């Protein structure tokens, strides 16, 4: 199993470790609900060093991005971030990723850990225009400092005014005495905060500085278990669950990151997605809350009010904030309106549920 620069720290803290995307990662330290609520109310730190990082450079960088990304990279100014996906050739999704415009002709993609090899092969295959690609996944460490108190904790460790870093923008500078740190107002929790990218040799120094600075705010480490419940309460898609090779961005409600500008004519599956956007969808991803007691899980069947099977759960959990079962899943389009009554099949029983508008945690 691969390790991150923080693996020994997690083990020393008594974290419950488990293999995730080929890495030995902390699932929880003292309890998922406790870590979840600490991020919502205070501040928590996630090791996300397993995520990938690809540099895209040179005069053909933008041309390459306008082909492989679903979004319109020409709209990005230096210092801005964009949520995107790679459409495949069959109307599905290779992966979703964040795109950073680092310099005029230098961008950074941040794909999912489980898909680094697949995404890298896809990018190289699509790079017919000679953009300079570099896979820096093993040379960059990453921490997500998330929660309403993240700014006050982190401000003690940098001269950069963190209030100037608005949502989906970033700055590069000194943090905890370490140079060239990317401080990005992004995250997968919906609780506010930042993601930090830095060279692995600074990992211990940055970790120690954060936990020292955050003592008054009750800073705690958080594992991948809480990361999943937090993202699900926001209705954020997880690759491999809610989106995959066979789901289209339009079905998944990601039409807002799918652009059809004139400089994106050679984007894979453009025609398929344009047709879907014009109204040709058989199924849609919806968010639902259980009205009965129970926990929906991936692959559970979804029925309509009459008991006919109309879809399948892609993600589900017991929401720590709402204290009820919540989930997402694909249903036939005619049953996808907010307020529609559903039945979730749990061990032969049909539990009542209702389609809601995400996020679950308001």
From Swiss-Prot:
<dbReference type="Pfam" id="PF08669">
    <property type="entry name" value="GCV_T_C"/>
</dbReference>
<keyword id="KW-0808">Transferase</keyword>
<dbReference type="InterPro" id="IPR006223">
    <property type="entry name" value="GCS_T"/>
</dbReference>
<dbReference type="GO" id="GO:0008483">
    <property type="term" value="F:transaminase activity"/>
</dbReference>
<dbReference type="GO" id="GO:0004047">
    <property type="term" value="F:aminomethyltransferase activity"/>
</dbReference>
<dbReference type="InterPro" id="IPR013977">
    <property type="entry name" value="GCST_C"/>
</dbReference>
<dbReference type="GO" id="GO:0005829">
    <property type="term" value="C:cytosol"/>
</dbReference>
<dbReference type="GO" id="GO:0005960">
    <property type="term" value="C:glycine cleavage complex"/>
</dbReference>
<dbReference type="GO" id="GO:0019464">
    <property type="term" value="P:glycine decarboxylation via glycine cleavage system"/>
</dbReference>
<comment type="function">
    <text>The glycine cleavage system catalyzes the degradation of glycine.</text>
</comment>
<dbReference type="InterPro" id="IPR027266">
    <property type="entry name" value="TrmE/GcvT_dom1"/>
</dbReference>
<comment type="similarity">
    <text>Belongs to the GcvT family.</text>
</comment>
<dbReference type="InterPro" id="IPR022903">
    <property type="entry name" value="GCS_T_bac"/>
</dbReference>
<dbReference type="InterPro" id="IPR028896">
    <property type="entry name" value="GcvT/YgfZ/DmdA"/>
</dbReference>
<comment type="subunit">
    <text>The glycine cleavage system is composed of four proteins: P, T, L and H.</text>
</comment>
<dbReference type="Pfam" id="PF01571">
    <property type="entry name" value="GCV_T"/>
</dbReference>
<protein>
    <recommendedName>
        <fullName>Aminomethyltransferase</fullName>
        <ecNumber>2.1.2.10</ecNumber>
    </recommendedName>
</protein>
<dbReference type="InterPro" id="IPR006222">
    <property type="entry name" value="GCV_T_N"/>
</dbReference>
<dbReference type="InterPro" id="IPR029043">
    <property type="entry name" value="GcvT/YgfZ_C"/>
</dbReference>
<keyword id="KW-0032">Aminotransferase</keyword>
